Amino acid sequence: MEYDLTLFEKGLEELGIVLSDEQKKQFITYYEYLVEKNKVMNLTAITEYDEVILKHFLDSLSIVKVGCFDQKKLAGKSVIDIGTGAGFPGIPLKIAFPEMKITLLDSLNKRVNFLNEVIDMLSLKEVTAVHGRAEDYAKQKEYREKYDFCVSRAVANLSTLSEYCIPFVKEGGSFISYKSGKIDEELSQAGNAVKILGGKVQDVVKFPLMDTDMDRSFVVIRKLKPTAKKYPRKAGLPSKEPLA
């Protein structure tokens, strides 16, 4: 089937991202498989082609608007995507910037199986999908404070997400949270949690998502010092009792 790439290419141009024909084909293959598998398992509520292009693919890639996520300096950088779900933003980032090393973490095994199928189908290298909870993986030596970037589009308040994500980031690295446009109250509530976990809010980047009624905010948290060993707390606590 032929797909109109006009919208996708317009969005890529706005973001300053140049993809080869092969990379564009990988995105289309990913789209087709996502929609096919979504018929038998709950991966996404968004399945219409243009909507997936805008609200999944281009939204995932819009992280390049964040200053520290400079696409010219991503070679060899390590990224972990927490609560990746159907692979957003991790898979689009891996397709667009194949020189990055990416770990995709999700708590649902069938989603991880789907991600492994996508990785094989697209012949992606240096990307690993793992099944488990952030609270558990962040305690493991091979994951804790090992990543240049932690990213997440997961729906949770910023205090909770910070406890999930900041422990994975090495000193000098960044946790970048994909948030909706209205972030000010959540940001003020999370300030102390971010500090406790060894981070500092470095930047907030706000913009409208192209051709949609969506506003996107990126909260950029810089890791200044190691996270105390007691964090994250045991599974379930960060969401039930967010750090104040």
Where are these regions (language model features)?
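Class I SAM-dependent transferase core
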Residues: 1-76, 80, 110-113, 117-127
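Residue-level signal for inorganic ion chemistry
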Residues: 34, 93, 179, 221
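Short loop/edge segments at beta-strand edges and connector loops
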Residues: 47, 131-133, 203-205
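Conserved SAM/SAH cofactor-binding pocket of Class I
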Residues: 61-156, 162
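Helix-to-beta-strand junctions that scaffold the AdoMet/dcAdoMet cofactor pocket
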Residues: 97, 169-171
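Short alpha-helix immediately C-terminal to the canonical SAM-binding loop
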Residues: 111-113, 183, 187
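Conserved beta-strand signature within the Rossmann-like core of class I S-adenosyl-L-methionine
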Residues: 172-182
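SAM/dcSAM-binding transferase cores
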Residues: 188-244
